[in-house]
C-alpha cells in the first residue's frame, strides 16, 4: 500500500493532481480545498495517501496532513458516505470546522456540501457526535449544551437566547458558544435578556 508520496506537481485535473515521483506520474484524487492549497506545476509537494484497491483499478486519494486523511476514513464509517462524498465534505469544511460542526450538532454547515442532502448531513452529525470532540478543540461545556439543545433539554431562556442571536445573523455554533459562556457567568437562573446581553459581549471580544 502507498501511504505517502513526495514528488513534483506535473499537472491538475478537475478533482485530481498528477504527482511526478521519480519519473512516474501518480494520479491522486483530492478534495477541492487540498487542490487549492497545493503549489503550481513544477514545484515540490508531499501528500498523505489512502490507497483503494478494486478488481479493475487502484485509486489514490491525497491529503495535506495525516489528520485530514483520518477524517476521510472516519466519514466513510457513516452509512451512505463513500469516498466521493467524504472528499466533497472535506472540500467544503476544513477538518477543524468539520469537527466543530459535528461536536456542536451543526447540521446546516455539513449540509452546505454540494451533493449532500439534509438526511446525510444529519447522519454524519449523529453517527460521529461521540468521536468528533476528540478531534476538535471545542469547549466541553459548549458540546454539552449543544447536546441539550438537540435533545430539547436546555432551559427555555438558553434556547430563546440562542435563537435571538441566530436571528441577529450569527451562526448556530457561534450563538451556542456565546450563550454557553454567558450561562457559566450568569448562573442557572439567568433570564433570556441577560443571556443575550452577555452573549453579545462574548461575541464582541
Swiss-Prot record:
Q: Alphabetically, which GO biological process terms does the record hold?
A: DNA recombination; DNA repair
Matches recorded under SMART domains: HhH1
Q: Cite the Pfam families for this sequence.
A: HHH_5, RuvA_C, RuvA_N
One term under GO cellular component: Holliday junction resolvase complex
Q: Where in the cell is it found?
A: Cytoplasm
Q: Where is this region: Flexible linker?
A: 144-154
Q: Which domain of life is it from?
A: Bacteria
UniProtKB keywords:
Cytoplasm, DNA damage, DNA recombination, DNA repair, DNA-binding
Main subcellular location: cytoplasm
Give the UniProt family note. Belongs to the RuvA family.
What does the record note on quaternary structure? Homotetramer. Forms an RuvA(8)-RuvB(12)-Holliday junction (HJ) complex. HJ DNA is sandwiched between 2 RuvA tetramers; dsDNA enters through RuvA and exits via RuvB. An RuvB hexamer assembles on each DNA strand where it exits the tetramer. Each RuvB hexamer is contacted by two RuvA subunits (via domain III) on 2 adjacent RuvB subunits; this complex drives branch migration. In the full resolvosome a probable DNA-RuvA(4)-RuvB(12)-RuvC(2) complex forms which resolves the HJ.
Record-linked HAMAP family? DNA_HJ_migration_RuvA
Return the domain comment text from this UniProt entry. Has three domains with a flexible linker between the domains II and III and assumes an 'L' shape. Domain III is highly mobile and contacts RuvB.
Q: What is this protein called?
A: Holliday junction branch migration complex subunit RuvA
Species of provenance: Nitrobacter winogradskyi (strain ATCC 25391 / DSM 10237 / CIP 104748 / NCIMB 11846 / Nb-255)
- Gene name for this UniProt entry: ruvA
Amino acid at each position: 500500500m502507498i501511504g505517502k508520496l513526495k514528488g513534483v506537481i506535473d499537472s491538475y485535473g478537475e478533482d485530481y493532481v498528477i504527482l511526478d515521483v521519480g519519473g512516474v506520474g501518480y494520479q491522486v484524487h483530492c478534495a477541492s480545498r487540498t487542490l487549492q492549497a497545493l503549489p503550481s506545476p513544477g514545484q515540490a509537494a508531499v501528500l498523505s495517501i489512502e490507497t483503494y484497491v478494486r478488481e479493475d483499478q487502484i485509486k489514490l486519494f491525497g491529503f495535506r496532513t495525516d489528520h485530514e486523511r483520518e477524517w476521510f476514513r472516519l466519514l466513510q464509517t457513516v452509512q451512505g458516505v463513500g469516498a466521493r462524498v467524504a472528499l466533497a465534505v472535506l472540500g467544503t469544511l476544513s477538518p477543524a470546522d468539520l469537527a466543530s460542526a459535528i461536536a456542536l450538532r451543526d447540521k446546516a454547515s455539513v449540509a452546505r456540501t454540494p451533493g449532500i442532502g439534509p438526511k446525510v448531513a444529519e447522519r454524519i452529525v449523529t453517527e460521529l457526535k461521540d468521536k468528533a470532540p476528540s478531534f476538535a478543540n471545542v469547549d466541553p461545556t459548549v458540546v454539552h449544551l449543544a447536546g441539550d439543545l438537540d435533545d430539547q433539554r436546555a432551559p427555555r431562556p438558553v434556547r430563546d437566547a440562542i435563537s435571538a442571536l441566530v436571528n441577529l445573523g450569527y451562526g448556530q455554533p457561534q450563538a451556542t458558544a456565546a450563550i454557553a459562556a454567558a450561562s457559566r457567568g450568569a448562573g442557572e437562573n439567568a433570564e433570556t435578556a441577560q443571556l443575550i446581553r452577555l452573549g453579545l459581549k462574548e461575541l464582541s471580544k
